[in-house]
Structures are given as structure tokens and as C-alpha cells.
């Protein structure tokens, strides 16, 4: 066997190995990434107080009451105060009403002060957002939260009002999705009655 013939055979042998290796790599399937599961809001609770359930009335059943209801004076949310009145609720804990993801957490300016918005994925695939306004402090600015996890403290919108929590609940058709909005409007399409929704989804 001549040297040239031997060289050709060796070259052909390595070419076959490389070809088979390339085919194996081409046919090798990439692993399918595991999708990140969405956190589901399968139950709701009130955002203030020592218990998950509150009455809207100023009574002895709990320490809180709904001072301005949804729809009252074109109000787009609810204003929660302590029964003791004034600024006695300043610094009280504010909790997430359900499992969700924070999509907004910053000072929204005059009339709002600090605001947190949480997006909630419902079991049926729809979404709602809860808004917590006039906070004295924001304690969590991003990421997932669990139901009744503290996200802030009751405040007074940088001194503009007596301390209270302004709570809103919105559905996906809301024109103020991911935004603070105005707090009042004659048109309430896209906003939900917070207490009614919470009571229906405990």
C-alpha cells in the first residue's frame, strides 16, 4: 500500500467520524425549559386588621371601618380607617389581599403619596389588580407576594389627608391598568367593589 493510499483511507475514516458526530449533534433535541408556574390567587382577604375578615361598619366586631365606600361620591375604591379616628391608624400594617406579583411601587405624586399595585392571576385565567394608596412606607417593591403578606404601612399621602388606606380593585378592562389613576370618576367601568369581591372569593 502506497503512502498516498494510506493517507486517503485515514482521511476518509476521520471524515466519517466527524459526519456521524455532526449528525448526532443535529439530531440531539434541546431540553424543553420548564415553564415558570404562575402564582395563583385562589383566595382573598382584607388588607388591614388582625384578621382576614372585617365588617365595613364602625362596630365592635373589629377595629376598622369603611369610611368611604366604593361608588360613594364617585369613589373608585374604599377608604379604610380605624374606629378610633384621626391619625390613629398611621403606620398600621397593610397586607396583600391575595397571592400576586407587584407591578407598581412608587410615589405617585400629589393626592396619592406612596402606591403599590399587585396583579393577581385568578384560577379561571383572568386577572385583577389591587391598589393600595396613601402609604406611609412601602416595604416591598417587586416580586411575588402571598396573601396577607405585609407590603406597607397606612399613611396620609404625604400629609394631605388624615391617615387611611385607599383600596381599589380593577379588572383587565380598566383604563388605569398598571397606573395610579384619579381615585374618583363618574364612570366606574373596569373597577370592582373591593369588599364585595373579597367576600365572594375567600
What are the functions of these language-model segments?
Residues 1-3:
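N-terminal Sec-pathway targeting helices
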Residues 84, 124, 138-139, 169-175:
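Feature marks short, surface-exposed loop/turn motifs that line or immediately flank catalytic pockets
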Residues 6-16:
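Bacterial N-terminal signal peptides
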Residues 20-22:
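Bacterial signal peptide processing site
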Residues 116, 144-202:
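Conserved, short, structured surface segments that act as functional micro-motifs
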Residues 89-91, 96-137, 163-164, 168:
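Zn2+-dependent peptidoglycan hydrolase active-site motif and core
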Residues 24-114, 146-147, 192-202:
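Surface-exposed, glycine-biased beta-strand/turn segments
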